[in-house]
C-alpha cells in the first residue's frame, strides 16, 4: 500500500489482539535468518495447557530428493495466565507446525494469573552459501515433541521444538565442475518463506522502489549420491539472450494455495493463521539468460512481516549442489510483485525445475474487519491460483466498562549492535467500546516476571508515545493497521500526563474519556547478544468503579543456521518437574522447575558433549548428538529440594531418571531423560492459653482458648496461611519448607496479652503477639501465646451550657441534653456513640485500659466554649475533641461546654436627597424612624427607632432569617430599591429580608426623600345671573365653609372663603381628595359644569385628584332666591304679576333635600307664562314658575308650570297632595298638569279653580323660601331648586351639585334630561317639581287659614 502521507510504498500490517501471530526478524548475521515467535498475553483467560500440532515436511516432488536447511526454534514461554477480576476465555489457540523450511508455533502457558495467547512464529529457513563452498549441508525437518494436555493419566511432555539436521558430506570438486555442454539438471526443490508481520513497514520514504533482495534462497541438495550423468543432459553452450524478456508463457507451474487454520479452531484470523503456497515450476529450455518470470499476489496477501528488513528473505534461487545462482529476485512491494531473472544457468542446463513452498499471510490492511469469502490469489507466470476464507477477528479484551486491544506492529532487532540494537512498535486500542470512563489510565510495561530475558524497555530517553483520538462511530482496523490521518493527534494534550516509572513502565492519564484512543509506543530494544531473547510488553486499562482490562504481547527470537558436519545427529532432552506427591511419576498439575543444569557426557569417553539449563517450564534440549550412549547428569537443584524416587512405573518418558542416568541415542531423538524433585514439608505451631495468674507461663490448671486467629507470614511479611485455635487452644501450620517464619496472634476479644518469655522453658512461656519461628529440617511446635481476661472501666462526664462563656462549669449552668458523643480508639475507629441525658450527662462503659478519643458534636445553635480555662479538669471544658486515658480505673473528667452565640442586625435610614437609591456622602440619616424585626413566620420580635444619625440595631440575635420593616417617616417617600451594586449602600426598601450566619449583618438600610406638597382651592362667587359661570362683575362670597376629605373620607382640613370668596388648602400630597362647599343660607346652588371652562361651578361636592401639581380650579357659585311672592292675592291677577313669581318660590323649599333631582331645573320657561305657558316645554319642569316673575301675572301665570307632568311626582308625594294644589289654573295649560297623576291625584279637585287663587297663591313667597315649610317634607323638593334657572326657557338641564373632576380638573357632564338613559333623572326632576308645587299650594292654604 502507499504511505498515506509521503505516497511512498509501504506495507502496514496490524497484529490483532487475542490471536496468534507469525513474525520473522532479520538480524545482521551472515548466513543466518532470525525467526520470531510471538504471543499475545491476555489477562483474565481460563487455565488451559499449551497444545501443539505436529506435522512433517514432505518433498514437493518425489522424483526430486531435497532436504530442508537446518533450523532451530526456541519457543517463547506462553503459559496461560490467571488474573483475578478478569473474564475467562477458553478459546485459546496453539499451533506448532513444521513444514519444509517453515515452522509456525504458538502456545499458552501460565504466567502469574495472566493468560497468554501465543502468536504464531513464522519460520523462514534461509542459508547463505559462500561462493567458494562446493557443498551445502543437508537437513530435514522432523516433528518435535511438544508440551500437550495430559488426559487419562498421561504425563505432560515438555514444551520442546527443535529441528533434526542431516548434513551430507561435501561432494568432490569433480562433481562441481562446470560442463561446457548444456546438461540436464536434477529436479530442484526450492523452498522460500516470505515472512509476514502485522506491522506498518516503510519500504522507501521517497518512492515506490523495488527492493532487491540479497538473502539467497538455497535449493535443497539431493539426499541421494550425486551423479552428474543421471537425469541431467548437458546442453551445448549457447550465447545468452541479448534482450531481457518476460517468459511467463514459458513457465509451467503446478500450484496449490491453502488456507492453514494453524490452531485448528475453525476460525481464520490474519496474522495468526496463514496461507501455504506450494508450486512445482518447470522452465522451458527456450528461456535464456536475462529472461524473467513473475510472481504476482493479490492485495489481500502479504509476504513479509513485522521487520521491514525481512523483505530480503525473498532471495535468489540457487542450486544447492554447487551454490550456483539460477535466478535473482527483485521484490516490488508497492505492486505486490516478485520478479525472478534467470542467470546463464539456464543457458547451460536443460529441463530446469524448481519447487517453492512459501508461507504467506493475509493482509490486515485490506481486511480491516471480519468478512466472509475473502479472496486470496497468487499468479506464477501466467497461472493464477485462488482460494477464499471467512475472516473472523477475535473480540477485544473487555472487563466491565474497560476495553483494550494491542499488538506489536513493527520490530527490527539487531543482535549484538550496541549503537543500534533495533526498535519495536506497539499499537494499543484504548476504549474501543466507546464507554464513558472516569479517571481512565493506561499502563504500558515492558516487564513480566516470567520473562527475565525480556529485551523490551520503556523510559523517557528511548520511548516515543503518540496518542490519537478516534472519532465517534469510527471503525478501527481489527488488524491494528491504523490510518492516523483519519484520527486526531492529541499527543500534545497528554505530554504532561505521561509518567514513566520503574520496571520499564509508563502511565498515561486520560482522565474522563468517552471515546476511543489509539496509542502508538515506539521504543528501542535493549542491547543483547542473545540469539534467543524474548520481548514482552503488557498493557492495562483501568478506570474508577470498573475492573481493569489487561493483556500483553510477546515475541520470541530464534536463529536458523545452515551447515553441519556430515553425519546424522539427534537430540537428548525431557523435563525437570516438582513431584509434589513424591511418587516419582509426572502427573497432571505438577509443574516444571527451571534453572536446573543438565550436562551430557559421552558415556564411552566421558567427554562432555552438551549442556543446557531448564527453561521456566522445566524443559531442556541438547541437540547435535550422533548415535551412542550418553550419561545425563542434573545439578544446581533449587535450594531445599530433594530428589524423588527413580524408575517408578513402566513409562520411561514419565518416570524420573534420578540425578544421573545413561540413555541411548539410536537413529532418533531420545527425550526420556527427566528428573523429579520435591520440597520436604514441616509443621509449625503450639498453643494459646488463658493465663489466669498472669505470670506468662502455662500452668497445669490453665486451659486453652479456642477460636484465636493465628497468622503465618514469610520473612518479607507476606501472609502465607491463617488458622484458628481448636477447642483445646491448639493450632498448627502444615506443609512448610525450611525457613524463617513470622507468627502473629490476634488478641481474643475481652483478653489482654500476658507477659512475654517469663520463664526459661520456651515450650511453656508466652511468645507474645508476634514471634519468629525457624524450621530447619524438623517441625517447630514451640510457638505459643498467653492471654488473661481484660478488666473493664467507664469513661464520661458532662456537657453543659456555658452561659457566661468562661469555659468552666458554674453551679447555675445547666446540662445540654441530646448531644452526640463519639468514642474512638487510637486508630480513629468508632467504638461507641451515645447522647447526653436530660441533665447533660453521658458515659461509655466496658472499656479496657488504653487511650481513647472522645468527640462531642456541637449542638445546633451553639458554639464551643473556650478549652482548659481552669486548673480543675473536672469542671473545665475539654473542647469538641479530646483524648481520655483509662489506666486501671474509670475516667469521669471528659466534659465539654457550649454557649449560644448571638449577633447584631441593622444599619441605617437616610434621606436620599437626590432620590437615586444610594447613600451619598452628603446625605444624612433620618432619626426617629420606626423599624420592626420579625421572624420567618411574621411574628414581631423587636421594634426600635433610628437614632439621631439614622442608625438602628437589633442585638442578641441567633443565626436565622429575619424580616425587617421600615415605617415611612411623616413627610417622606421611600426611595428606589437596590439601585446600585453595593448592598451596604443601596436601599433595601420598606420590607426586606436579612440573614444572620455566624456573623453580624449590618447591611439592611432604607432611604427616603421628602414628599413634595401641593395646594388646592379657588373661588366661591355670587352667580347673579344664574348662568353657572363666573362673570367679571360677579363677586366672591365670603365665609363659605369648605371642607377637604382624604380618599378614606376622613376630614383633613376645613376653611372659609375670604372676603373675596377665595379659599385654599396647602401642604397636600399627591392623591385623591373630596371638596365639600357648604351652601350659604338663603342662597341657591347655581348650575354646575355648564361649560368646559374652569370658570363654571363645580357643585357642592367635588372629587379631585392631585398628581404632582397644584389645583386651583375648584370653585362654586350661588344665587339669591326670589321672594316677592306677593301673592297679592287674589290673583288678581291683575297684574297678575306678581304672583308670578309667586310660584317661584316653588322651589325654594326644595332644597331640602336637594335631592335630587336636580333637575328641577328647568323651570325654564318660566314664566312665560304667558301662559302660553305652555312651557310645555316639556320639561318644564322646572316648575318653571320660574318666577320669572313678573309678570304676567296674568295670572294665567299659570305658570302652570305645566311642568307638571313629570308626574313622576315622585316622592314627595306624601305630601301634600293637598292637591288643592289645584294649581289652579287648571287652567290652562292645558295639559298642564296633566301630570296628574302623579300623585297628586288630587288634582282633580281643585280645579275649583276659582283658582283665582291666583293670588294668594303666589304666596309666593315666602314660602319659597325656603321651604321653611318645606315641611313638605322636604322631600321632594329636592330639586325644587331647580328652578334656578329661571331661565326659562332654555331648558338646559340642571346639573347636580355633586360632580366629579377628572385629572385635568374638568367637570364630567351629566346626561341631558332628554337623553333616553336619563329617564330616572327626568322622573326625579318632575317629581321634585310636583312636590314643590304641592308644597307651595299647601303652604298658601295654611297662610290663608292663618289670616
Curated annotation (Swiss-Prot):
Motif LPXTG sorting signal, per the record, lies over 1310-1314
The biological processes this protein is annotated with in GO are: cell adhesion
Does the record bear Repeat in its keywords? yes
Regions of compositional bias (Acidic residues) in chain numbering: 1091-1101, 1118-1286
Coiled-coil stretches are: none
UniProt feature, compositional bias: Polar residues: 62-71, 94-109, 146-155, 163-173, 860-869, 972-981
Q: Which cellular component appears as one GO term in the record?
A: extracellular region
**Keywords noted in UniProt:** Calcium, Cell wall, Peptidoglycan-anchor, Repeat, Secreted, Signal
Gene3D superfamilies, alphabetically? 2.60.40.1280, 2.60.40.1290, Immunoglobulins
UniProt region (Disordered), positions on chain? 55-185, 857-883, 972-992, 1078-1323
Biased composition, class Basic and acidic residues, residue ranges: 130-145, 174-183
One Pfam family of this chain: SdrG_C_C
Signal peptide positions are 1-35
List the InterPro entries: Adhesin_Fg-bd_dom_2, Adhesion_dom_sf, Fibrogen-bd_dom1, Ig-like_fold, LPXTG_anchor, SDr/BOS_complex, Sdr_B, SDR_Ig
Q: Which residues form the CNA-B domain?
A: 569-680, 681-791, 792-901, 902-1012, 1013-1123
Cellular compartment(s) = Secreted, Cell wall
Motif YSIRK-G/S signaling motif per UniProt: ranges: 23-34
Region Ligand binding A region, residue ranges: 36-568
User: How does the record say this protein sits in the membrane?
Assistant: Peptidoglycan-anchor
Q: What does this protein do?
A: Cell surface-associated calcium-binding protein which plays an important role in adhesion and pathogenesis. Mediates interactions with components of the extracellular matrix such as host DSG1 to promote bacterial adhesion to host cells. Contributes to the resistance to killing by innate immune components such as neutrophils present in blood and thus attenuates bacterial clearance.
Describe its assembly: Interacts with host DSG1; this interaction increases S.aureus adherence to keratinocytes.
- Which family is this sequence assigned to? Belongs to the serine-aspartate repeat-containing protein (SDr) family.
Checking NCBIfam families in the record gives: LPXTG_anchor, MSCRAMM_SdrD, YSIRK_signal
Tell me which PANTHER family the record gives.
CARBOXYPEPTIDASE REGULATORY REGION-CONTAINING (PTHR23303), COLOSSIN-A (PTHR23303:SF15)
Official protein name in the record? Serine-aspartate repeat-containing protein D
Q: Which organism is it from?
A: Staphylococcus aureus (strain MW2)
- What gene is this protein a product of? sdrD
Amino acid at each position: 500500500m502507499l504511505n498515506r502521507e509521503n505516497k511512498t510504498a509501504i506495507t502496514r500490517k496490524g497484529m490483532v489482539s487475542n490471536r496468534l501471530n507469525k513474525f520473522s526478524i532479520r538480524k545482521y548475521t551472515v548466513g543466518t535468518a532470525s525467526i520470531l515467535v510471538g504471543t499475545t498475553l491476555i489477562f483474565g483467560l481460563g487455565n488451559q495447557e499449551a497444545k501443539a500440532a505436529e506435522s512433517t515436511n514432505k518433498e514437493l516432488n518425489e522424483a526430486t530428493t531435497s532436504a530442508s536447511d537446518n533450523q532451530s526454534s526456541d519457543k517463547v514461554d506462553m503459559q496461560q495466565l490467571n488474573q483475578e477480576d478478569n473474564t475467562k476465555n477458553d478459546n485459546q489457540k496453539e499451533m506448532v507446525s513444521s513444514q519444509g523450511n517453515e515452522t509456525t508455533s504458538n502456545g499458552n502457558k501460565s504466567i502469574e494469573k495472566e493468560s497468554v495467547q501465543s502468536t504464531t512464529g513464522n519460520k523462514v529457513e534461509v542459508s547463505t552459501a559462500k561462493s567458494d563452498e562446493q557443498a551445502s549441508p543437508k537437513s530435514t525437518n522432523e516433528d518435535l515433541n511438544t508440551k500437550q494436555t495430559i488426559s487419562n493419566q498421561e504425563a505432560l511432555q515438555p514444551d520442546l521444538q527443535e529441528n533434526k539436521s542431516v548434513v551430507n558430506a561435501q561432494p568432490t570438486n569433480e562433481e562441481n565442475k562446470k560442463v561446457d555442454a548444456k546438461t540436464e539438471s536434477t529436479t530442484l526443490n526450492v523452498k522460500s518463506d516470505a515472512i509476514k508481520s502485522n506491522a506498518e513497514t516503510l519500504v522507501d520514504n521517497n518512492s515506490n522502489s523495488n527492493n532487491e533482495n540479497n538473502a539467497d534462497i538455497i535449493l535443497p541438495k539431493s539426499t541421494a549420491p550425486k551423479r552428474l550423468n543421471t537425469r541431467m543432459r548437458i546442453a551445448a553452450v549457447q550465447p545468452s539472450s541479448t534482450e531481457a524478456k518476460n517468459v511467463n508463457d514459458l513457465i509451467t507451474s503446478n500450484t496449490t494455495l491453502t488456507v492453514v487454520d494453524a490452531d485448528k479452531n475453525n476460525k481464520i484470523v490474519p496474522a495468526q493463521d496463514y496461507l501455504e503456497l506450494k508450486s512445482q515450476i518447470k522452465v522451458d529450455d527456450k528461456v535464456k539468460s536475462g529472461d524473467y518470470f513473475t510472481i504476482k499476489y493479490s492485495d489481500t496477501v502479504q509476504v513479509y512481516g513485522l521487520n521491514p528488513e525481512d523483505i530480503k528473505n525473498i532471495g535468489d534461487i540457487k542450486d544447492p549442489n554447487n551454490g550456483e545462482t539460477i535466478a535473482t529476485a527483485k521484490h516490488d512491494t508497492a505492486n505486490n510483485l516478485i520478479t525472478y531473472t534467470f542467470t546463464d544457468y539456464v543457458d547451460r542446463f536443460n529441463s530446469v525445475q524448481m519447487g517453492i513452498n512459501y508461507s504467506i499471510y493475509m493482509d490486515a490492511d485490506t481486511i480491516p474487519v471480519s468478512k466472509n469469502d475473502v479472496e486470496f490469489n497468487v499468479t506464477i507466470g501466467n497461472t493464477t491460483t485462488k482460494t477464499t476464507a471467512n475472516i473472523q477477528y477475535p473480540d477485544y479484551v473487555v472487563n466491565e466498562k474497560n476495553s483494550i486491544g494491542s499488538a506489536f506492529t513493527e520490530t527490527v532487532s539487531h543482535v549484538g549492535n550496541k549503537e543500534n540494537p533495533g526498535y519495536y512498535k506497539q499499537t494499543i486500542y484504548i476504549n474501543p467500546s466507546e464507554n464513558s470512563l472516569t479517571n481512565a489510565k493506561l499502563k504500558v510495561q515492558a516487564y513480566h516476571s516470567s520473562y527475565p530475558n525480556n529485551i523490551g524497555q520503556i523510559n523517557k530517553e528511548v520511548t516515543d508515545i503518540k496518542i490519537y483520538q478516534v472519532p465517534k462511530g469510527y471503525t478501527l482496523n481489527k488488524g491494528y493497521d491504523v490510518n492516523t490521518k483519519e484520527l486526531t493527534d492529541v499527543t500534545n494534550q497528554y505530554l504532561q500526563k505521561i509518567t514513566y516509572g520503574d520496571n520499564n513502565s509508563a502511565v498515561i492519564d486520560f482522565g474522563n474519556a468517552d471515546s476511543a484512543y489509539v496509542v502508538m509506543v515506539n521504543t528501542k530494544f535493549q542491547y543483547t547478544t542473545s540469539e534467543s531473547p524474548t520481548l514482552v510488553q503488557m498493557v492495562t486499562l483501568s478506570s474508577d468503579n470498573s475492573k481493569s482490562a489487561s493483556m500483553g504481547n510477546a515475541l520470541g527470537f530464534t536463529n536458523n543456521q545452515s551447515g553441519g558436519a556430515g553425519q546424522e545427529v539427534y537430540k537428548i532432552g525431557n523435563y525437570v518437574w516438582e513431584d509434589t506427591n513424591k511418587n516419582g511419576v509426572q502427573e497432571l498439575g505438577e509443574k516444571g522447575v527451571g534453572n536446573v543444569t543438565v550436562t551430557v557426557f559421552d558415556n564411552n569417553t566421558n567427554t562432555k558433549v552438551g549442556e543446557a539449563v531448564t527453561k521456566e517450564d522445566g524443559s531442556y534440549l541438547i541437540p547435535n548428538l550422533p548415535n551412542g550412549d550418553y550419561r545425563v547428569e542434573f545439578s544446581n537443584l533449587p535450594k531445599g529440594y530433594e530428589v524423588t524416587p527413580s524408575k517408578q512405573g513402566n513409562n520411561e518418558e514419565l518416570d524420573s531418571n534420578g540425578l544421573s542416568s545413561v540413555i541411548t541415542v539410536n537413529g532418533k531423538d531420545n527425550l526420556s531423560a527427566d528428573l523429579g524433585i520435591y520440597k520436604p514439608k514441616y509443621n509449625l505451631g503450639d498453643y494459646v492459653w488463658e493465663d489466669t495468674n498472669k505470670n506468662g507461663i502455662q500452668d497445669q490448671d490453665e486451659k486453652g482458648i479456642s477460636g484465636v486467629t493465628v497468622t503465618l507470614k514469610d520473612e518479607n511479611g507476606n501472609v502465607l496461611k491463617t488458622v484458628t485455635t481448636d477447642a483445646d487452644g491448639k493450632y498448627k501450620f502444615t506443609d512448610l519448607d525450611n525457613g524463617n517464619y513470622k507468627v502473629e496472634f490476634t488478641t481474643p476479644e475481652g483478653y489482654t496479652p500476658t507477659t512475654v518469655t517469663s520463664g526459661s522453658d520456651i515450650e511453656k512461656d508466652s511468645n507474645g503477639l508476634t514471634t519468629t519461628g525457624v524450621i530447619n529440617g524438623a517441625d517447630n511446635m514451640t510457638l505459643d501465646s498467653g492471654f488473661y481476661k481484660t478488666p473493664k472501666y467507664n469513661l464520661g462526664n458532662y456537657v453543659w451550657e456555658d452561659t457566661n462563656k468562661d469555659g468552666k462549669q458554674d453551679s447555675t449552668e445547666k446540662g445540654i441534653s441530646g448531644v452526640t458523643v463519639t468514642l474512638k480508639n487510637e486508630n480513629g475507629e468508632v467504638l461507641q456513640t451515645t447522647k447526653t441525658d436530660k441533665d447533660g450527662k453521658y458515659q461509655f462503659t466496658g472499656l479496657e485500659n488504653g487511650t481513647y478519643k472522645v468527640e462531642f458534636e456541637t449542638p445546633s445553635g451553639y458554639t464551643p466554649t473556650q478549652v482548659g480555662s481552669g486548673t480543675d479538669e473536672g469542671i473545665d471544658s475539654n473542647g469538641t475533641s479530646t483524648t481520655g486515658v483509662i489506666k486501671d480505673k474509670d475516667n469521669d473528667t471528659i466534659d465539654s461546654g457550649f454557649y449560644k452565640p448571638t449577633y447584631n442586625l441593622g444599619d441605617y435610614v437616610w434621606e436620599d436627597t437626590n432620590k437615586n437609591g444610594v447613600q451619598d456622602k452628603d446625605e444624612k440619616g433620618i432619626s426617629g424612624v420606626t423599624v420592626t424585626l420579625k421572624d420567618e413566620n411574621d411574628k414581631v420580635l423587636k421594634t426600635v427607632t433610628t437614632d439621631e444619625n439614622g442608625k438602628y440595631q437589633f442585638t442578641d440575635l441567633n443565626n436565622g432569617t429575619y424580616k425587617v420593616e421600615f415605617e415611612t417617616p411623616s413627610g417622606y417617600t421611600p426611595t428606589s430599591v437596590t439601585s446600585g451594586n453595593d448592598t451596604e449602600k443601596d436601599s433595601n426598601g420598606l420590607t426586606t429580608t436579612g440573614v444572620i450566619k455566624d456573623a453580624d449583618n449590618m447591611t439592611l438600610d432604607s432611604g427616603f426623600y421628602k414628599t413634595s406638597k401641593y395646594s388646592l382651592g379657588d373661588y366661591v362667587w355670587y352667580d347673579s345671573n344664574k348662568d353657572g359661570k363666573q362673570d367679571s362683575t360677579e363677586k366672591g362670597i365670603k365665609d363659605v365653609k369648605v371642607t377637604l376629605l382624604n380618599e378614606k373620607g376622613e376630614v383633613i382640613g376645613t376653611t372659609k372663603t375670604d372676603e373675596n370668596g377665595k379659599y385654599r388648602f396647602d401642604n397636600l400630597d399627591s392623591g385623591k381628595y373630596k371638596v365639600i362647599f357648604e351652601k350659604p343660607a338663603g342662597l341657591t346652588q347655581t348650575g354646575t359644569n355648564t361649560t368646559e371652562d374652569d370658570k363654571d361651578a363645580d357643585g357642592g361636592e367635588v372629587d379631585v385628584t392631585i398628581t404632582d401639581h397644584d389645583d386651583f380650579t375648584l370653585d362654586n357659585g350661588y344665587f339669591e332666591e326670589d321672594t316677592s311672592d306677593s301673592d297679592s292675592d287674589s290673583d288678581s291677577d291683575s297684574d297678575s304679576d306678581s304672583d308670578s313669581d309667586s310660584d317661584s318660590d316653588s322651589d325654594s323649599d326644595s332644597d331640602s333635600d336637594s335631592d335630587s333631582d336636580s333637575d328641577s331645573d328647568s323651570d325654564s320657561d318660566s314664566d312665560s307664562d304667558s301662559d302660553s305657558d305652555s312651557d310645555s316645554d316639556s320639561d318644564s319642569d322646572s316648575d318653571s314658575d320660574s318666577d320669572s316673575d313678573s309678570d304676567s301675572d296674568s295670572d294665567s301665570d299659570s305658570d302652570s308650570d305645566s311642568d307638571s307632568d313629570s308626574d313622576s311626582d315622585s316622592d314627595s308625594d306624601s305630601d301634600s297632595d293637598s292637591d288643592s294644589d289645584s294649581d289652579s289654573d287648571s287652567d290652562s295649560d292645558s295639559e298642564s298638569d296633566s301630570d296628574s297623576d302623579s300623585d297628586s291625584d288630587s288634582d282633580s279637585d281643585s280645579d275649583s279653580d276659582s283658582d283665582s287663587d291666583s293670588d294668594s297663591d303666589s304666596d309666593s313667597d315666602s314660602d319659597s323660601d325656603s321651604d321653611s315649610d318645606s315641611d313638605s317634607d322636604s322631600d321632594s323638593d329636592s330639586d325644587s331648586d331647580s328652578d334656578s334657572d329661571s331661565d326659562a326657557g332654555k331648558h338646559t338641564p340642571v346639573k347636580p351639585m355633586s360632580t366629579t373632576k377628572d385629572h385635568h380638573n374638568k367637570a364630567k357632564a351629566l346626561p341631558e334630561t332628554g337623553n333616553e338613559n336619563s329617564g330616572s333623572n327626568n322622573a326625579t326632576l318632575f317629581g321634585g317639581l310636583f312636590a314643590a308645587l304641592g308644597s307651595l299650594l299647601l303652604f298658601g292654604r295654611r297662610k290663608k287659614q292663618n289670616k
